[in-house]
Structures are given as C-alpha cells and as structure tokens.
Amino acid sequence: MDTTKIKLISFDLWETLIFDSKNHNQRNKLRINSLRLLFDKFGQNISDEKILESLSFISKNCSQDHNSGFDKKTDIRIKELLNFLDIKKDNKLFEKEILNALDSSFLKHPPSIFPTAIKILNSLKNRYSLCLTSNTGITSPNIYRKYLNEVGIFDKFDKLYLSNELLVSKPSFSIFKIILDDFKLKPDEIIHIGDNLFTDIFGAKKCGFGTVFINKRNSVNNNLKIYPDYTVKDISKIPDLFL
C-alpha cells in the first residue's frame, strides 16, 4: 500500500505500546488480597484459590467476548465474577468496592511502556493524527485514561477507543467503522498497528484499513490466512515506514 496517503495511525495498546512485566504477578497478588479482605468485610468467606479462579474466569470471558467482537461494561464483569463465586448479594456499594479494588491494583502495579514508545508517538504526531484502539479487560476506562496520562502518552492521541466503553471490540468491523466516521477519512487513509493477527490485522483489513503487524514472536500462523501490509519486529521500526 501507499503510505503517502495515510492521515491517521491507529495503535493497539497491549503488547504494542505497553507490556506486562513482573508487575503482573504483583498485581494479581494485590487483587486477591484486596478482594479477600473485601469479601470478609461483607461476610463472604472466599479462599484465595477461588478468588484467583474467578479472576481467571473473567479474563477468559473477556478474551472470548473480544474475539466475538463485543465487550461489556465493568459493572457487568463484576456481576459475572460474583455469579462465578456464587455470591448472591445485590449490593451496589459492594460491587463498586470490588471494582475500585481491582482498579487500584492496576494503578499500584501497572504495565510497563516500551522504552521507545513516547519518542515514536511524538515524532508521528507531528505529521499524522493518532488514535488508540484497544480491547480492554476488567479495568475501568477512566483508570486506563489515568494510567495513560501517568506514563505520558494520553495526550499523544486525538481519540481513544476502549472496548469496554464502546461495547464493541476488535476484530469487529464496528469499532473500526467508528474510527472511520469520527475522523471522516477514507479507509486507505488510515493504518492500524497491532500485535494480534486476528483482532488487529484481520479486524482492520475488514474495514479497508492498512495494517502493520508487530511480530515480536517472529512467527505468523499461516492457518489464519491473514496477511498484513507490513510486518515489523517491534514499534522501534515504525518510523522507517512513515517518516
């Protein structure tokens, strides 16, 4: 494709701009401890093992929903977690405190940003519009915004598209169509960058976007029959395509 036509660059978030290092395990431990104390406070005796199971269950549910092209608001995810634990407590304060505990754990032990990400976004922002298009988990949209601001990339984007806010997810045509309509551009004037062949590359190509595949693992599942326009090892190679 002709990159000289590009006016908007859409970035995936996880494993494209940020990654989970050792903080992931620390975050999970804090989540488990915080939830156990909270359950005790509300008279629910739940083991650490069961809490971990519930978090894994929600994570799996999120991934399955995303692959199907939709997402749910965080309060619905909390209800799913409580149903998994067989807690029949219809208490808005209880549910809100659970979500706050999970959000707090995310900020306490956040993911790391790739070292070159800020420099690359700064250089691209001088020439292109930028947006962030991310499938999200159980973390609240406002917490994502706070985190992105804390790591210094929130203001690099003209728009943010978070799946648990829009209730649609990559690879759905719908989330990419929203971008198309918001920026009032033609499909060949937009390129999406991401590390997932299915959700990022397949999804963006359905809407006619150009695509850049971040192939950090140096392997492509040819069974998917999905072919990106460009493939790079990591985002440090992105400026070579656009600058």
Regions from the PLM with identified roles:
Residues 3-115, 119:
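N-terminal helical cap/lid subdomain that shapes the substrate entry/recognition surface
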Residues 127-128, 208:
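Glycine-centered short loops/turns at secondary-structure junctions
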Residues 112, 127, 139:
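Residue-level signal for short amphipathic helical patches enriched in basic/charged
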Residues 14, 124-125:
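Glycine-rich phosphate/diphosphate-binding loops that line cofactor/substrate pockets in enzymes
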